[in-house]
Structures are given as C-alpha cells and as structure tokens.
C-alpha cells in the first residue's frame, strides 16, 4: 500500500500570508502528517502530491527526503487523478493539513481496509470533535 499526501493546494480559505501546510503543530503540519504515515509502518512508500501553488511546502518535503509527485495544481480531484493513473497498488489518500492524524489512527484505517471494496471513506462524529476540543460547525451527525 502507498500513502499519498495531498500537499499542493492554495490554502486560500485560511487567508494566510504563508502556505497553510507550513503552520506549526509541534512541527510543520505537513511533516506531522508524513511522519504519522511513516511511523504507522503500513506503507511501502509515501508520496506527497505538490504543485506550483505550494513551492515552500515542496522545498520542505524535498529537504526531508520525501518523494514528490508534482502536478499542475488545477484542483484536488484533478491532481489526485494524475497520480492515481501512475500507480498500480492500493493507496491511502490523506490531506496534508490533518495534524491530529497519528500512527494509531492510520493503523486502524488500514486494518479495516477491505481490498474487495473499491474505496473506503473515514468520517468523524461530532462527539469525537468535541472530545478533542474542536467546535463542530458543519456536523450532520
């Protein structure tokens, strides 16, 4: 299984001066996510999907010897489809802006993966968000 980290977005919703994935949560959040994937020991390789929208993030990933797949940065789905066309393996796709994602969560997701199904989606409940101190604004549960 290959771990894919989406790291090429513009991050415009946060209205920041710098790239969103460089925000610190113990360390830059993109590195927090990549390290969680690595520390789970679930993947044969980890690839970060970058674009011209995130040059500083790409540089940081390269400095940390993370494999890069560069895309045009058209959009999440378009960029993801580009790399999926080149991979003949199962993948776990995550956004690079999930600093609370840890190796144990990843192990549970991979453990519940069923290769007979085309895809698996992981959602969290309002109760979980509240338990980690996050105010839920868009919950349906």
Predicted segments with their positions:
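Short glycine/proline-enriched coil/turn segments at helix->beta-strand junctions
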Residues: 1, 26, 41-44, 62-66, ...
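N-terminal glycine-rich phosphate-binding loop and ensuing alpha1 helix
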Residues: 1-55
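Active-site metal-binding loops of divalent metal-dependent hydrolases
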Residues: 10, 97-98
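A generic secondary-structure signal
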Residues: 36, 40, 82-86, 108, ...
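Conserved beta-strand termini and adjacent loop/short-helix elements that scaffold enzyme active sites
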Residues: 49-51, 69-72, 122
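Active-site acidic Asp-centered loop
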Residues: 51, 94-96
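Short phosphate-binding loop-to-helix
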Residues: 56-93, 101
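Conserved core of the sugar-phosphate nucleotidyltransferase
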Residues: 101-141
């Amino acid at each position: 299984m290959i771990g894919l980290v989406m790291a090429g977005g513009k991050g415009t919703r946060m209205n920041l001066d710098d790239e969103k994935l460089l925000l610190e949560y113990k360390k830059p959040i993109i590195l927090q996510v990549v390290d969680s994937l690595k520390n789970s020991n679930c993947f044969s390789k980890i690839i970060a999907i970058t674009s011209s929208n995130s040059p500083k993030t790409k540089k940081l990933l390269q400095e940390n010897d993370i494999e890069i797949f560069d895309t045009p940065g058209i959009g999440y789905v378009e960029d993801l489809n580009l790399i999926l066309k080149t991979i003949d393996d199962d993948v776990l796709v995550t956004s690079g802006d999930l600093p609370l994602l840890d190796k144990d969560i990843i192990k549970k997701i991979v453990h519940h993966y069923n290769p007979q199904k085309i895809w698996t989606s992981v959602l969290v409940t309002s109760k979980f968000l509240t338990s980690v101190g996050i105010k839920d604004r868009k919950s349906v549960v």
